[in-house]
A protein has these predicted regions:
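A compositional/biophysical signature of low hydrophobicity enriched in polar/charged and small residues
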Residues: 1-153
Length: 153
């Protein structure tokens, strides 16, 4: 979907804030009746603008008190090595995000763990066992200043 009008953007903003908003509430807030509002939401879903609906869960409530950002440098940057690394880390629940980067690192990962011992186990039993890693640098988050999954619309 290439062009989003003001109503589409308002719908997206509201749904990003509360994905459980009823269609009636959504329609009222964007100034439409329910049917046209529903059609717009369905169109946004069909076009992939709305990719899914999820519940955000507090990581500390699950006992995951440690957030770690890990810079990974591979020994080689060949496509097969990049693909092998991406396949491996995609299977690990501890890895919440992974980005292929430019600059002095190849990958940046965001990982959560219950505590330092759990992170150490992840590091020793998973990450360091992957072939082709030249260096691993871990940075621990002291506190979370801002967190949002809502995109600017």
């Amino acid at each position: 979907m290439t062009s989003l009008d003001a109503i589409h953007r308002k719908i997206l903003g509201l749904l990003q804030t509360d994905g459980r908003t009823t269609m009636q509430e959504l329609a009222d807030k964007v100034g439409l009746s329910v049917s046209p509002c529903h059609r717009r939401v369905k169109l946004l879903e069909e076009r992939g603008v709305i990719s899914r609906y999820v519940a955000t869960v507090d990581q500390k409530a699950l006992g995951l008190h440690v957030s770690v950002f890990i810079s990974i440098k591979l020994a080689r940057q060949k496509e097969e090595d990049l693909n092998r690394f991406a396949r491996a880390i995609s299977k690990w629940d501890e890895v919440l995000e992974c980005y292929l980067m430019t600059g002095n690192r190849d990958y940046l990962l965001r990982v959560v763990a219950a505590d330092l011992s759990s992170y150490e186990a992840f590091l020793k039993n998973k990450l360091t066992r992957l072939d082709g890693i030249a260096s691993i640098e871990s940075s621990f988050a002291l506190s979370q200043v801002k967190y949002s999954i809502a995109l600017p619309v």
